[in-house]
Amino acid sequence: MNMLSSLDDSAARSRAATAAPFGAASASLAFSDVEPGEDQRWSTWPATQPSERGPQPRPEWLVTSAAAIDTELGIVKTGKEADLWLIERAVPGAPAEVPGNATLLAAKRYRGAENRLFHRSAIYTEGRGTRRSRDVRAVQRSSSYGREVARVEWAYAEFAALSRLTELGAAVPYPVQVSETEVLMEFIGDGRVAAPRLAQVRATPDGLRDLFHQIAGFMRTLAHAGLAHGDLSPYNLLVDRGRVVAIDLPQVVDVVANPNGFDLLHRDCVNVCEWFTRQRLECDAEELFAELVGDVTR
């Protein structure tokens, strides 16, 4: 069974599980009479604090009803730091075409502290606020508590970065909410098919120029705010029907406060320009870096 057919099967199970309780013939059922089915849970939105929810103004597609059910439709991507799941959040029985009744979300769930991101975390976290000494020691010892602390910290760091960049107008998925080690965000794709990464895209020369200008514009938006992605590459840039969207953002750095900030910004420039150069589009990493440094220090 391929991924798409698996997602379709999960969606069919979710519809079957919820159609009867919320159908027209069952309108008299009390809310308490309904229970989520397999691969489902009640929407976690009502349980989150205001600070754990995405910034205002919120998009009209956002589902905030306490009657909504979250259904896991399948795994989209397994990564080194986290797994990405496709979630449908919907109010069963409500017209799906009406904004606020149903939407697809990406659930990024951080796994553990044994991988690349956590091992190199000090590079990115210098200049950030301090943690409790107990937490610092636990993370350094890689105890079970320390691993959990690290997972939660990176989830909240990604949510904070997405929220900040959304407010700046940068092209990133809208952050819906964060809870423990899970970040729920806008799903970027066509239907249930995730948008391809830049590394998978083959474009015309004009198309490549447009993609580069979008990416440079994204980097410029961050630089104006004194920030850098910190790990930018063709693998964490999605191309959604011609629009570039940046993902994987827990390591966003304050270029000035972090001693490694300008080095990380330079690496971002090199990674981007190397890919475009391989596609036979002229791109000067040093020129891009100099321009962005000027934006940071302006």
Walk through the language-model features, giving the residues of each.
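Juxta-kinase regulatory segment immediately upstream of eukaryotic protein kinase catalytic domains
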Residues: N2-G74
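Conserved short alpha-helix within the protein kinase catalytic core
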Residues: V149-V152, P205, R209-A216, R220
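Residue-level "edge-of-site" marker
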Residues: V178-S179, Y235, F289
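AlphaC helix of the protein kinase catalytic domain
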Residues: V193-T204
